Amino acid sequence: MKKPTEEKTKEKAANKNQKKRLVLLDAHAILHRAYHALPDFSARNGEPTGALYGLVAMLLKIIEELKPDYITACFDLAGPTYRHDAYEHYKAGRAKTEDSLVKQIDRSRDVFAAFGIRIYDHAGFEADDMLGTIVEQTKKMKDIDVVIASGDMDT
């Protein structure tokens, strides 16, 4: 029979060789997908919550299945990006985001805070840009695997 300290030593050695896992979230894309995929849930006060429900369900699933060491959410901010400077018609055909989704996007920051998830956003850049930058920076760290969670096909 192995001694408990011997087992712990082997377990620690195995964990040292194991890579850490970083999950990156495209917050806007995830919320947008949840908003359109789920019913129009609302709180007693009438506040829309369907996209937030979808977000929480997804976060719980990611945490349970992927067991990440780190999670980061990236947001788009309102306003033009450097892409608008390069191409004046960038996203020109897009419909205005519905107010009930905008409210949930704003409230999602509270959800991420409750989960202890760090948020990144930067004027002039989209979440995709930040995700790509984080991935490029993380590639330099050989001990971290990156998983991107997004509902956006161009991420």
Residue ranges of predicted features:
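Noncatalytic, basic helical substrate-engagement surface that gates or grips nucleic-acid strands
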Residues: K2-A149, M153-T155
